[in-house]
Regions:
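Sec/Tat signal peptide C-region and signal peptidase I cleavage site
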Residues: 11-19
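A short glycine-rich, His/Asp/Glu-containing loop-to-beta-strand
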Residues: 20-51, 57
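Short acidic-glycine-tyrosine-enriched beta hairpin
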Residues: 28-33, 43-45, 73-93
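Ligand-binding loop in jelly-roll beta-barrel domains
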Residues: 70, 78, 94-121
């Protein structure tokens, strides 16, 4: 087996997961116990987030910076694809059952802005 074949095979074994990078966090001085947090989520081609819940206090604004994101919250009839420059809102405690790159060939990037209690995690993965 050639070196390039081995490298390609090892790439296929790597899990395609998103990467969330905090960009900003600041306590809201006029709203006691709340903070504003922004996170950029990078999705390689074909990457998916594990199902998760958002904090019970978190109001979320999501904006697609590039590519296309497929998203579905519990109770929605089907997943929706959001393209670059499109956005949506998520209510506190939302259960994200689908959150993934809609493309297997292009990367996607999402900006998520949270208003959340200062003592809460932004997301909690579903129990397996």
């Amino acid at each position: 087996m050639t070196l390039s074949s081995l490298l390609f095979a090892s790439l296929l074994l790597v899990s395609k997961a998103e990467t969330a990078t905090p960009q900003f966090q600041h306590a809201l001085p006029n709203v006691a116990g709340k903070k504003l947090v922004s996170v950029v989520v990078d999705y390689p081609p074909g990457a998916k987030s594990a199902p998760h819940r958002h904090a019970p206090s978190a109001f979320i604004y999501a904006y697609v910076l590039s590519g296309s994101i497929r998203s579905q919250l519990e109770g929605e009839p089907a997943a929706k694809i959001y393209h670059a420059d499109e956005s949506w809102f998520e209510n506190p405690g939302a259960h994200h059952v689908v959150s993934e790159n809609a493309s297997d060939t292009q990367s996607a990037q999402l900006l998520a802005v949270f208003v959340v209690n200062t003592d809460e995690a932004l997301t909690v993965p579903d129990a397996h």
